[in-house]
Amino acid sequence: MPICEFSATSKSRKIDVHAHVLPKNIPDFQEKFGYPGFVRLDHKEDGTTHMVKDGKLFRVVEPNCFDTETRIADMNRANVNVQCLSTVPVMFSYWAKPADTEIVARFVNDDLLAECQKFPDRLVPLGTLPMNDVQRAVEIFGKRIFFFEIWSPAKKSPEEVKRCVSMGIKGFEVGSHVAEKSLDHRDFWPLYKLTESFKLSTIMPGFCEFFENWGLTTKTPGICEELSVVLFVHPWDMHMWDGRLDKYWMPWLVGMPSETAQAICSVLMGNILVLFPKLKLCFAHGGGAYPQIRGRVSHGWNVRPDLCAGKCKVAPNKLDGLLWTDSLVHDPKALELLINTVGKEHIVLGTDYPFPLGELEVGRVVEEYKPFSAKDREDLLWKNAVKMLDIDENLLFNKDF
């Protein structure tokens, strides 16, 4: 019997932006790199598969997590036209050596692209990046040579930077943090937008200032804004809080919403959406706990600006309308709060397929939300995703149910 079964609530068009996938055959990275912490798959005779980490069972998954034909059958049964596929966060491997994380990321992305090409009108890939070394992350798109981009008329072609996107990747899933670094950390700025040529300013202090004084730029086009690439932020590596989350499935029920709220607050109060207003950040699980604590965060920003408003002079509640989230909140009242936080124009359907904590009746909360008009439902079920991902809807929806 399946761990969980996804079903349909209607025949409405649907684009699910939050669906996970694993490669069917994962190399033994522990053996390859010579240290533990990596996941491998152990396929069992009963049809289940064990995700194994350091010799211990991490999670049981079924073929719909790695077999594309099984996935498509589930999508047909649940009347899902399109899924946006992203890896399971345990595959991020941000804790590993950066060169090794890059190898894992490239393997995951190559497998993801290959599987999506089997059903290009049904599956949209969202890749992964070695976020523990953002320079490597940028080079996943294509190498950029910061030094020559300052003055060379024959600077590197943007087409090379667009290599990965031209292969079909519409965005990247990133973790809610990387070790001690939240998403406002300056190390991530090269991935966000027009950022200072940090390589030069680090190697040769004052060099960039010298050129800028002469009216020459040391700024490089930012990858994600330039290419209209979405960063899908997923909570991961939830802290165990001295063991208090060890039982009752607390890391997933409490840890994940808290982790996502912390990531959103870092982005808002870290000035990221002021510096990079075109950046598309979509947060999983309806933004986690952020809609519930939004008023508290804004109040704290007002009464303790010395602690909260150091980098950003714009109140958080004036910026959260720039955020995107998925719709995975499980409750109509929670959806209403989310709408009042980010706006119904910035919410996209998400299920967390194929895991049991997802929305098993796909689109149920959206379709049963009584204040919605037919247009509102259509927007949340698929049209907002088309806008966020910047995809041609004419290339999709070749499957009628």
Curated annotation (Swiss-Prot):
Enzyme class: lyase
Pathway entry: Secondary metabolite metabolism; quinolate metabolism
Reaction catalysis annotation: 2-amino-3-carboxymuconate 6-semialdehyde + H(+) = 2-aminomuconate 6-semialdehyde + CO2
Coiled coil residues, start to end: none
Keywords per UniProt: Decarboxylase, Lyase, Metal-binding, Zinc
GO annotation, cellular component aspect: cytoplasm; cytosol
TM ranges: none
Biological process, per Gene Ontology: negative regulation of quinolinate biosynthetic process; secondary metabolic process
Enzyme nomenclature, EC number: 4.1.1.45
Residues reported in the UniProt entry to bind substrate: 59
Stored InterPro entries: ACMSD, Amidohydro-rel, Metal_Hydrolase
Residues noted as binding Zn(2+) in the record, renumbered to the chain: 18, 20, 234, 352
Gene3D superfamilies, per database record: Metal-dependent hydrolases
Molecular functions per Gene Ontology: aminocarboxymuconate-semialdehyde decarboxylase activity; hydrolase activity; metal ion binding
Pfam families per UniProt: Amidohydro_2
UniProt function note: Converts alpha-amino-beta-carboxymuconate-epsilon-semialdehyde (ACMS) to alpha-aminomuconate semialdehyde (AMS).
PANTHER family registered for this protein in UniProt: 2-AMINO-3-CARBOXYLMUCONATE-6-SEMIALDEHYDE DECARBOXYLASE (PTHR21240), 2-AMINO-3-CARBOXYMUCONATE-6-SEMIALDEHYDE DECARBOXYLASE (PTHR21240:SF27)
Annotated family: Belongs to the metallo-dependent hydrolases superfamily. ACMSD family.
Subunit: Monomer.
Protein name listed in UniProt: 2-amino-3-carboxymuconate-6-semialdehyde decarboxylase
Gene: acsd-1
